[in-house]
Amino acid sequence: MPTPRMFLAAFLFSAVLLLADANAQTYSLLHAFSGLADGGGPEGQLIEDASGNLFGTTNWGGDGHCRNPGCGVVFGLDPSGVLTVLHTFTGKDGANPLGNMAYDGSDALYGTTADGGALMDCVNITKPVGCGVIFKLNKVTGQFTVLYRFAGGADGAGPNGLIRDAEGNLYGATGGGGMAGCGNSGTCGTILKLDTTGKHTVLYAFTGATDGGFPIAVVVDKAGNLYGTTNVGGDLNCNPNSGYGAGCGTVFELTAAGDFKVLHAFAGGKDGEELASYATLLLDPAGNLYGTTPYGGVQDCSGVPGCGLIFKINSAGKGTVLYSFSNGNLAYGENPYYGLTNDRAGNLYSTTTYGGNPFACYPGGCGTVDRLDRNGISTVVYTFENQADGKYPTFLTSDSAGNLYGATVGGGGYDASGTIFKIAP
């Protein structure tokens, strides 16, 4: 029997649809993954080349290595919607690609896998031996090269994405390895550099204390300074009993000279909480940093402390909450796990993993795409319905024409395993 709460949810959802329609942008499905040879669970941010081709990875699928359902693939999607698998991981060359790839602007893609690589220090009975790899793939010829295999000790384990500087050096983070001190997981992660000769260097090893632990992929400025976030550590009075270690995470700077500084330690509640985030920071030309936290904010979120927020840290290090996602209206989305992209007008776009239509993925919703304008007004751009459009959106990419490209890790029709989509202005 319908309850008053269900009628209220339906009314609020309809009201948001009216707001979204007033600012309508056009959604198109570009590809639905089968979970077989073409992969499944696309999670990293898509890369667009000058010809309009999109490139990305799937966390699983492929040809059946890594037991069922496969170790993942690297794919290309041309402007006509034809998907080509550029590389299928087998375990020894990496497994389960995670995080964003980097692109040299010509032919080379660089990425990471969370597992695989065949070194013996990281063993999981459901996956191949290995602590992850850094790889290079020529998107034209298909030539694949493992540039570095992680051993799982001081060098790190479980890399989660890359960024490339103007000289061709690669930078990234590992969620494990490094120093001990992060709850039940033991090690706290590292920041790394791989130079153009293939030399791997640990630039910083986290302790899990006030400096943070479990870092998320970094961004780099023109001066070579790195910025990123951690999932734990910082304010150790926040979430002190977490099995992953105390603290709600940090925003940090690692200068080109090697000096480490915490720019902000999340305090939980209205200030935000990074636990379990995949979000990479967005760096603007003025040196301001923008990001999301999946938890925290102004309201309780179905028993969890807050539905997440969008924040800014200016070049002087001052932090500001720009927007808090609210459980008061589920249709506006909840839990922005995957960070931000922007357009030329200065709008910020995010995805929420939950929220939207509460009846599509009952009771939490299948996620939304949202726009935050320069006046702080948030608008729902698209609501996922768990039909052909998929569910649980991840990272977004924007182009110079104002188009948004993104992926969902699930849905896309019966027995489908995620989608690639486009939202045109």
Regions found by a protein language model. Give the residues of each.
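Extracellular beta-propeller repeat domains
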Residues: 2-425
